A protein has these predicted regions:
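Non-catalytic, C-terminal membrane-associated alpha-helical segments of glycosyltransferases
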Residues: 219-223, 237-308
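Acidic donor-binding loop at a coil-to-helix junction in glycosyltransferase catalytic cores
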Residues: 178-184
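N-proximal low-complexity "stem/linker" segments adjacent to membrane-targeting elements
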Residues: 1-28
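Short aromatic/hydrophobic "clamp" motif used to bind/position activated sugar donors
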Residues: 87
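Short, flexible, basic/aromatic active-site loop/helix in glycosyltransferases
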Residues: 119-120, 134-151
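Glycine-rich, basic loop-to-helix element that forms the pyrophosphate-binding segment
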Residues: 49-52, 66-82
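Acidic donor-binding segment of Leloir-type glycosyltransferases
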Residues: 23-65
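Conserved donor NDP-sugar-binding/catalytic core segment of glycosyltransferases
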Residues: 99-131
Length: 308
């Protein structure tokens, strides 16, 4: 079987240190070097980040620039210059396994009419054997690709597709600062393409370790939800319904599993240890719901959604 040329797309915004680790991993791929390129899209990083200087250290990578804010705008810029028949997406804070491209391409080619492969995202902690409760929560609730595929999309931290699929269904929605991968993936599904989860196509991702990071993430995600709902005619009734049925609904089953020591979420293995961790885990859940409610209200009152 002829191996296709692959364009790997990596958007970055003020994250040059982690970008360096990502590019180092992409430089060491088992896939033939003459058959892939890495396109880094700088999305308006501060000058001292020196994205170009970082990219120039790696022979497989080039850098392009997109001044309009938003990771999906940046990805579209890279798509416009990509040479590959296969397009692979990851993020600057991810560390792909050495066989990531090889496995992603193999999975994409193995399924007839495949339009999207969502690979595994493994979380790692600052102290591998002693994750904080916030890190532990993020590792369970984070980017659950197997669950996302059941909802007809994959997170662009680890996605493979064909350029021909993008040509047919269109680029990412540039009005969205979050959840654009969900919106795009559902277009791929609606066009009749197969979508698969690939456990062996793996990138590592750092778990968020602080309440500030979780706060920022949830405000960004809530903004993405809001922007998509606004396109559908989001009303005050819809806002109240979301708050009452989603944010204020007690997670009784989750709390029960948490305190009896069972697996907390059906899609991710893991149980809390000891009363202090269980109580803080519960606090994280309450904290996130409070953040989401406040952001829903802020956005409905005319606030702008936030970028990454």
């Amino acid at each position: 079987m002829i191996q296709p040329f692959v364009s790997v797309i990596v958007p970055v915004f003020n994250d040059s240190e982690r970008l360096k680790k990502c590019l180092s991993a992409l430089e060491k791929q088992t896939y033939p070097q003459q058959l892939y390129e890495v396109i880094v899209v700088d999305n308006g990083s501060d000058e001292e980040q020196d994205t170009k200087g970082v990219v120039n250290q790696f022979s497989q990578a080039i850098v392009v620039y997109e001044s309009r804010p938003g990771a999906y705008v940046a990805r579209n810029k890279a798509i416009s210059v990509a040479k590959g028949d296969v397009i692979a997406f990851t993020d600057a804070d991810c560390i792909p396994a050495t066989d990531w491209i090889e496995k992603g391409v193999a999975n994409l080619l193995s399924v007839p009419n495949c339009g999207l492969v969502a690979g595994q995202i493994k979380y790692f902690f600052k102290e591998p054997d002693k994750p904080t409760t916030v890190e532990f929560y993020d590792s369970l609730m984070g980017i659950a690709q197997k669950r996302f595929i059941a909802l007809n999309y994959g997170a662009t931290a680890n996605v493979f597709t064909f350029k021909s699929v993008i040509d047919q269904v269109g680029n990412f929605d540039e009005t969205l600062k979050s959840s654009g991968d969900s919106e795009w993936g559902k277009r791929v599904f609606a066009a009749g393409y197969e979508q698969i989860y690939a456990d062996d196509t793996c990138v590592a991702h750092p778990a968020r370790s602080s309440y500030a990071q979780i706060n920022k993430q949830m405000r960004r995600i809530t903004g993405g939800w809001h922007d998509m709902r606004k396109k559908e005619g989001y009303s005050g009734f819809g806002l109240v319904k979301d708050i009452v049925t989603l944010d204020l609904k007690p997670p009784v089953k989750t709390i029960f599993r948490l305190f009896v020591g069972q697996q907390i979420f059906p899609w991710a293995e893991g149980s809390a240890k000891g009363i202090p961790q269980k109580l803080e885990f519960l606090y994280v859940m309450v904290f996130i719901r409070a953040v989401v409610i406040s952001e829903r209200v802020r956005l409905y009152m005319g606030g702008d959604s936030k970028r990454a």
